[in-house]
């Protein structure tokens, strides 16, 4: 297994649309394992393949404290089950150190495939619903900062660019 490099906002590669997975092979399983290792090391609770510059529809997630609930979503789609919105404070491994409130539907249904290509459905609410929507957005080139005002987005971008210059 390997720790993968996580792209950071405003890297334009984060805006790339992910392509559907068509081959469920050892290379895909290795990517999934590497993504989990990268996510746990960061540390985070979700990671989309787009964030590690692999533009395939793959998401890994684990909301547990002890890494006991790893979830894999391949070729996912999400459907709102309610128009009721909730506000959660979101952060992102691609936007390190920044947390902002984002409004999202409180309940969703996910259709996806597991690491072996087997289809499944899952109804989600609360933090799981938020995380699913956040990570699936990545597959469509969207970041949580896109839900913020232009002013907040620009401020975050400038701070991250300054950090990158200082690290260089």
UniProtKB/Swiss-Prot annotation:
Keywords tagged on the record: Hydrolase, Iron, Metal-binding, Protein biosynthesis
SUPFAM superfamilies attached to this UniProt entry: Peptide deformylase (SSF56420)
GO biological process: co-translational protein modification; translation
Cofactor annotation comment: Binds 1 Fe(2+) ion.
Keyword Repeat: no
CDD domains documented for this protein: Pep_deformylase (cd00487)
Active-site residues, Swiss-Prot/TrEMBL: 135
Species of the source: Pseudomonas putida (strain ATCC 47054 / DSM 6125 / CFBP 8728 / NCIMB 11950 / KT2440)
One Pfam family cited in the UniProt record for this chain: Pep_deformylase
Stated name of the protein: Peptide deformylase 1
Family to which this protein belongs: Belongs to the polypeptide deformylase family.
Keyword Iron: yes
UniProt cross-references to PANTHER family, sorted A to Z: PEPTIDE DEFORMYLASE (PTHR10458:SF21)
InterPro entries recorded: Peptide_deformylase, Peptide_deformylase_sf
Coiled-coil residue windows: none
Record-listed E.C. numbers: 3.5.1.88
Enzyme class: hydrolase
Listed cofactors: Fe(2+)
Role played: Removes the formyl group from the N-terminal Met of newly synthesized proteins. Requires at least a dipeptide for an efficient rate of reaction. N-terminal L-methionine is a prerequisite for activity but the enzyme has broad specificity at other positions.
Positions contributing to Fe cation binding: 92, 134, 138
Domain of life, source organism: Bacteria
Molecular function GO terms recorded: metal ion binding; peptide deformylase activity
Catalytic activity as recorded in UniProt: N-terminal N-formyl-L-methionyl-[peptide] + H2O = N-terminal L-methionyl-[peptide] + formate
């Amino acid at each position: 297994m390997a720790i993968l490099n996580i792209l950071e906002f405003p890297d334009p590669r984060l805006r790339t649309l992910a392509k559907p997975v068509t081959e469920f092979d050892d290379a895909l399983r290795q990517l999934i394992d590497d993504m989990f290792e990268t996510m746990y090391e960061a540390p985070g609770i979700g990671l989309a393949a787009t964030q590690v510059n692999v533009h395939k529809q793959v998401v890994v997630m684990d909301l547990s404290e002890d890494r006991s609930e790893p979830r894999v979503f391949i070729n996912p789609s999400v459907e709102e089950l309610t128009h009721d919105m909730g506000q959660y404070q979101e952060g992102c491994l691609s936007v390190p150190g920044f947390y902002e409130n984002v409004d999202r539907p409180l309940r969703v249904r996910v259709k996806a495939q597991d690491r072996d290509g087997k289809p499944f459905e899952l109804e989600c609410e609360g933090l799981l619903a938020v995380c699913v929507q956040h990570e699936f957005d990545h597959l469509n080139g969207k970041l949580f900062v896109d839900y913020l005002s232009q002013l907040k987005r620009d401020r975050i971008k400038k701070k991250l660019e300054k950090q990158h210059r200082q690290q260089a």
